[in-house]
A protein has these predicted regions:
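ABC family nucleotide-binding domain
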Residues: 5-6, 10-142, 147-148
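Conserved beta-strand-loop-alpha-helix hinge in the C-terminal portion
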Residues: 152-177
Length: 179
């Protein structure tokens, strides 16, 4: 009946999200009882899939987590926890990644490494990343940037530069304070 088909649709949506969509949140949502490696592999564990060890190694090395895999979240800095969350979002090689301020808790060097890695995953893996950020430098890594104000798109920039984005964001802040 209807209930059975609703559950079937819900199950299929869950599988789609688990397999084809990655999420990078501002709050890391790491499981405290698991190690960094177990947290990274969680989407694969839930799916009953075997990890691609080469991909895991690339993620871990790029994100600077090699020496931290056996640490639990409370033994990691905020930046390290965010990098674990990013690796977890990318471990399934999702087609689409939603990133909410993915570098918000990282220092400038770690931010640049993470943004470069996200850019590489777009160029080399064909992933699509939708990133929300208030950081002009982070936005400059995008192929396209949309600037929103009051729920409306006020600018659409292809291949944005940090200077362009900084200027646009400043204009929007000034406009918001005048209203």
């Amino acid at each position: 009946g209807l209930v059975g088909s609703e559950m079937c649709i819900r199950d299929r949506l869950t599988l789609l999200r688990r397999r084809d969509i990655g999420f990078i949140f501002q709050s890391f949502n790491l499981l405290p009882m698991f190690t960094a490696e177990q947290n990274i592999l969680m989407p694969l564990t839930l799916a009953g899939a075997k990890p691609d060890r080469q991909w895991l190694r690339l993620l871990v090395e790029t994100l600077g987590l090699k020496e931290r895999l056996n640490h639990r979240p409370n033994e990691l800095s905020g930046g390290q926890q965010q990098r674990v969350a990013i690796a977890r979002a990318l471990i399934t090689k999702p087609k689409l990644v939603f990133a909410d301020e993915p570098t918000g808790n990282l220092d400038s060097v770690s931010s640049a490494e993470v943004l470069s890695f996200l850019k590489r995953s777009v160029n080399e893996l064909g992933q699509t990343i939708i990133m929300v950020t208030h950081d002009a430098v982070a936005a400059s890594y995008a192929d396209r940037a949309l600037v929103f104000a009051d729920g409306q798109i006020v600018a659409d920039v292809n291949k944005p530069t940090a200077d362009q984005m900084s200027e646009l964001l400043m204009k929007e802040r000034e406009a918001a304070t005048m209203n």
